[in-house]
Amino acid sequence: TTLGNISSWVAQDLGASGPVLSHSITCSTAVHAVLNGIAWITSGMAKRFLVGGSEAPLTAFTLAQMKALKIYSKGGNYPCRALDMAKQTNTMVLGEGAGMACLEPGRKKGALACIIGVGYATEPIAHGASMSADGDCLKRSMEMVLNGIPPDTVDAVVMHAPVTLKVDRAVMEAVLRVFGKETPALTTNKWKLGHTLGTSGILSMELAILMLRHQHFIEVPYLGKVSGPEKLERVLVNAVGFGGNAVSICLERGTL
């Protein structure tokens, strides 16, 4: 009931008259909302859909959970070391925030970006927070989104990279299995924002859109100078959630 009330009050504030719904699918919640909105529009049941995610996990209870799991960062320079494959310990740092986007069908003039493909998958898990060592669910979601999109046309990938040793290795393995030697430039925003859990997917989409609009690859500072693409036309966004689920969304540069 509390969860549903969040979306209904957003609708009330905006004066929306269409359907209102909420869901919670752990760290991929926001991008599952994007999938949901696409389904409503594709079915003809909605002309446009407002989608997004919100999370406020900076509570004593949630922090205690993360520390009990022994995945929380001990601090230092850049305490949240997403994509640092040389790190020896878990470096989770929680963040909070919210993000929303308006989806419309077709290619609209002035659109920030265009969604040209989506993928999703679920894998069997050993326990609630586990993921296979090779990131099978993410591999399959990327293969689905790239069905019809040549992998070598993807200029960058916004990684999920939750900054735990096991899952960081798993998501990297999945990307390497899909792209191989043609792996695009990789980036993330978690070093700056922390892991915003259910909001993280929409904030990753925001990062992708910013790079596409400004034609500037945003690198991770502690990884050293990365040779980013000279031109950005397509960016793949990945999200993984507890429960063995993954979502991949490919964004293409919009026409402003």
Predicted features, each with a name:
Residues 127, 138-192:
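A beta-strand-loop signature enriched in Asp, Gly, Thr, and Trp
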Residues 13-14, 52-55, 96-97, 105-106, ...:
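Fold-independent oxyanion-binding glycine-rich loops
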Residues 3-7, 14, 20-55, 93-109, ...:
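Active-site-proximal alpha-helical scaffold in enzymes
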Residues 10, 30, 37, 66, ...:
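Conserved small-residue
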Residues 1-36, 68-93, 166-203:
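Conserved catalytic cysteine-centered active-site region
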Residues 77-151, 155-156, 256:
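Condensing-enzyme catalytic core mediating Claisen C-C bond formation in acyl metabolism
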Residues 56-82, 121-140, 162-174, 199-207, ...:
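Active-site-adjacent elements of ketosynthase-type condensing enzymes
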Residues 46-49, 154, 232:
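Short, high-confidence coil segments that cap the C-terminus of an alpha-helix
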